[in-house]
Amino acid sequence: MRGGGNMQQMMKQMQKMQKKMAEEQEKLKEERIEGTAGGGMVTVVVSGHKEVLDVIIKEEVVDPEDIEMLQDLVLAATNDALTKADDVTAQRLGQHTKGLNIPGMM
């Protein structure tokens, strides 16, 4: 069979890549990524799996007369953390798919 060895080598390479990616996914679960808003008045911490782990609000930003501002800050900090989590994930997993031209892969 022509090219059979090449296909077998490619399959081994894919299996190796899958194993490394699974290991990176596990590491990402333990990663803590912070997003902030309002000059650090609100901080949201997420895992690499995009699970919100903590929300920290400094006392001086709490104004009962302006709840909307606090809501906006929490939303902005959350979105910042999630964007950073996406960046970390793309960087970590992308290093294992570099050079491969497989549709649907990073």
From Swiss-Prot:
Coiled-coil ranges per UniProt: none
Pfam families in UniProt: YbaB_DNA_bd
Keywords recorded for this protein, A-Z: Cytoplasm, DNA-binding
Biased composition (Basic and acidic residues): 20-34
Compartment(s) where it occurs, according to its Swiss-Prot or TrEMBL record: Cytoplasm, Nucleoid
Membrane-traversing stretches: none
Region ranges (Disordered): 1-34
Protein name as annotated: Nucleoid-associated protein MCCL_1934
Organism: Macrococcus caseolyticus (strain JCSC5402)
